[in-house]
Amino acid sequence: MTLKLAVLRQIFQGSKGWHLWQHWRAFYSSSASGNGKLCCQTGTTDKNTHATRVVDLSYDLYDGSAPGPPLVLLHGLFGSKSNFQSIARALVRKTGRKVLTLDARNHGCSPHDDIMTYPAMSADVCQILHKLQITSCVLIGHSMGGKTAMTVALQEPKLVERFVSVDISPAATVPQTGFPHYIAAMQKVHLEGKIPRSTARRLAEEQLSSTVKEASIRQFLLTNLVQENGTFKWRVNLEVISQHLQDLLDFPEFQEPYPGPALFLGGANSPYISSENYPEIERLFPCANVEYIFGAGHWVHADKTHDFLNSICNFVESA
């Protein structure tokens, strides 16, 4: 089912509000051609062709016995595969399929590298799929991971049976995210000597609190504080992430659309998938649906886990 007016009307009622539906209806009517498809300019792929070194990603594989392509989970910026442990186990129980979770380059237990772009992260994912002899999969990516999933689908569509982009669209992300401030605050954290882990976390949180006001975000960032050789450090590559932050907020340009099923699953309380993004979603992913989960913000899978799992399972089983 494509992004048609009837689908969008059903989505808007009770979620983003009737005023958004009216706005989109007017926009669609003025932008669509006679056959109901949006008239959009095609881009180029010049930014996606440069070579880069592929990183051997760290992964966890949750075994399942049911047939069907495995589910591959991709985390967001400052996240790691451990964010999806409970989600992965639940998906194995509900679908019976294998579930693979990955640490992106410069995150978690994966190696660091000087390049942090979506084509590079796409190449990393393709390599691990090849290494594990996975010829087709269902990609599920949150935020940065969602843009990585889109890039893999657009570059290597035969590898992706379908995909889910969680609370992110193929549009440039407005830098209202606070990520530049988070990076700067993390870089300023200083922990002296060999101290207990509990003390290190407390001191780091105190230093972050002047910039990162939300306690939940501080706790999320602190999952990256690790001990190495008796001292504490950030396991994410802050320097490279900072250098490539604009690459991560942007999205590469593509000409050819992805022909398979896609789901853009947003939080109803989050601004990251809006009506302004629908034309580009329609252009690149003509078989996409857009759904919103009530009461969820950007971290949809954490805010409304039950609803998130139901949406994922319904989409996976809709083949």
From Swiss-Prot:
Transit peptide interval: 1-28
EC number per UniProt: 3.1.1.116
Transmembrane segments: none
Keyword entries, A-Z: Hydrolase, Mitochondrion, Transit peptide
InterPro entries reported for this sequence: AB_hydrolase_1 (IPR000073), AB_hydrolase_fold (IPR029058)
Any Pfam family matching the protein: Abhydrolase_1
Known function: Catalyzes the hydrolysis of diacylglycerol in vitro and may function as a key regulator in lipid metabolism, namely by regulating the intracellular levels of diacylglycerol. 1,2-diacyl-sn-glycerols are the preferred substrate over 1,3-diacyl-sn-glycerols. The enzyme hydrolyzes stearate in preference to palmitate from the sn-1 position of 1,2-diacyl-sn-glycerols.
Name assigned to this protein: sn-1-specific diacylglycerol lipase ABHD11
Source organism: Xenopus tropicalis
Gene: abhd11
